[in-house]
Curated annotation (Swiss-Prot):
GO terms for molecular function: rRNA binding; structural constituent of ribosome. This is Small ribosomal subunit protein uS17. It comes from the Bacteria. It comes from Chlamydia felis (strain Fe/C-56) (Chlamydophila felis). Transmembrane segments: none annotated.
Length: 83
């Protein structure tokens, strides 16, 4: 068969914080959760290096998707621009 079935790939939504590199952006993804013991709402963020084919710029909200390793740090790619 010509069509291969790929596994489900993770997607995340975040804000572009840096687009100074060629074809690469840094996306900050925020996570809000309740602390298991103290029940306080905690806001946590993490940065992901993503491949940028859509030429998004800083401040834009984007959806990124997991992909094969593209470089030492890049394992995500920008799939779509959200607003």
């Amino acid at each position: 068969m010509a069509s291969e079935v790929r596994g489900l790939r993770k997607t995340k939504v975040g804000v572009v914080v840096s687009s100074k590199m060629d074809k690469t952006v840094i996306v900050r993804v925020e996570r809000v959760y309740s602390h298991p013991q103290y029940a306080k709402v905690v806001r946590d963020s993490k940065k992901y290096y993503a491949h940028n084919d859509l030429n998004v710029s800083e401040g834009e909200k984007v959806r990124i998707q997991e992909t094969r390793p593209l470089s030492k740090l890049k394992r995500w790619r920008v799939v779509e621009r959200i607003s």
